[in-house]
């Protein structure tokens, strides 16, 4: 008798879940197919859109983060600055100068030499170099951040990642000169 009651209870719960999922799934599909889904850059974001995406992105990157294969040196910062100036500065700015060309993107590219957030973190200097390396290597879907795995060598991607990890520190005059060597778009 006890088994049949608990079995009936689970059956009702299962049927209730199925009955609930059908209209939710249908509603979600109808909203995506016929509704005003924010797909234009100027549209307001869905509630919690940034938070949901950030959770998924961070989870993936944290599972695949690699360790820095070499120690930091001035030569690496200089070569990282050269690569950054040619490949990254048009979206992410240089020390003291925000990039304006791609500001209308959604999400807007973070300015990697500028303090942000409640803690005043400079760019992504609070991220491990391996985290930034993953982003530089793979890009972020639907954000405008391209993958540089076919454009930059493995070493070059690490050099840029190490440079932006240290964006909150004093850079040598040579690194600053390289970063400021060309006009931003």
For each of these PLM feature ranges, what is it?
Residues 2-78, 123-129, 148-163, 182-185:
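Periplasmic c-type cytochrome electron-transfer domains
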Residues 67-69, 82, 93-100:
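Short acidic/polar micro-motifs centered on Gly/Asp/Asn
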Residues 74, 95-97, 116, 149:
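Short, well-ordered turn and helix-capping elements at secondary-structure junctions
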Residues 74-94, 132, 185:
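Sequence/structural segment immediately N-terminal to covalent heme-attachment motifs in c-type
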Residues 100-106, 175:
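Short cysteine/histidine-rich zinc-coordinating motifs and their immediately flanking basic loops
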Residues 104-165:
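Extracytoplasmic electron-transfer domains, predominantly the class I c-type cytochrome c fold
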Residues 167-171:
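Helix-loop element at the rim of GNAT/NAT acetyltransferase active sites that forms part
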Residues 173-185:
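Extracytoplasmic/periplasmic copper-protein system
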């Amino acid at each position: 008798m006890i088994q049949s009651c608990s079995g009936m209870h689970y059956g009702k719960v299962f049927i209730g879940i199925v009955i609930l999922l059908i209209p939710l799934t249908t509603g979600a599909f109808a909203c995506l197919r016929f509704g005003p889904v924010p797909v234009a850059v100027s549209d307001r974001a869905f509630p919690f859109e940034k938070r949901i995406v950030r959770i998924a992105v961070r989870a993936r990157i944290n599972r695949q983060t690699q360790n820095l294969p070499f120690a930091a040196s001035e030569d690496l910062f200089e070569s990282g600055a050269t690569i950054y100036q040619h490949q990254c500065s048009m979206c992410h700015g240089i020390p003291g100068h925000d990039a304006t060309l791609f500001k209308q993107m959604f999400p807007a590219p973070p300015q990697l030499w500028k303090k942000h957030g409640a803690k005043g973190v400079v760019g992504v200097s609070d991220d491990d170099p391996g985290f930034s390396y993953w982003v530089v290597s793979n890009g972020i879907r639907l954000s405008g951040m391209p993958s540089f795995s076919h454009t930059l060598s493995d070493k070059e991607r690490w050099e840029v990642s190490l440079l932006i990890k240290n964006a909150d520190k004093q850079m040598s005059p040579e690194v600053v000169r390289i970063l400021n060597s060309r006009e931003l778009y």
